[in-house]
Amino acid sequence: MMTRKSAMIGSLVVLGAALLLSRWTGTRDKDWPVPVEAAKLKNPVKATPENLAAARAIYMDKCANCHGEKGFGDGPEAGMYDPPPASLADASMMNGMPDGEIYWKITEGRKPMPSFKNQLSDEQRWQLVNFLRTLVPKPPAKKPGAIKP
């Protein structure tokens, strides 16, 4: 016959296993819903060399400690957070997000990422959107006259 203590221990083991399984199966960052209207926003800031340089300085000050200098999510503080910072150099993720969605995420934040709406101006946040686009590796250029596979 199972004692009350055994039942309690068994329940804790099952609960712990369920928590570990949910973390292991990658449920951490699949959904970060953005309002439809926010995703439709267009970037009013041009990606000029001056704006990109300003955004790089902001990124190095506000973002690189977590997301890493090149955006791989490997900054010196990345290991302190659960879930870990996203790789901003992930082409499939970044190319799937319109500028308005990136801007909204920078603006609103989500634990553990802070909101930057009171730390950075609208222009600075849009500059960051342009800079983040530069972190995504470009596909190799096709050679003229190359045969398609």
Residue ranges and their predicted role:
Residues 31-34, 76-81:
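Short, flexible, mixed-charge acidic loops at enzyme active sites
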Residues 72-73, 122:
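Short, non-ligating residues that shape and space the ligands of small metal-coordination modules
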Residues 2-11:
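Bacterial N-terminal signal peptides that target proteins for export
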Residues 20-30:
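Bacterial Sec-dependent signal peptides at the C-terminal "C-region" and cleavage site
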Residues 80-135:
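Extracytoplasmic electron-transfer domains, predominantly the class I c-type cytochrome c fold
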Residues 49-72, 78, 102-108:
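Sequence/structural segment immediately N-terminal to covalent heme-attachment motifs in c-type
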Residues 28-58, 142-143, 147-149:
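Electrostatic cytochrome c docking/interface patches
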Residues 11-18:
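Bacterial N-terminal signal peptides
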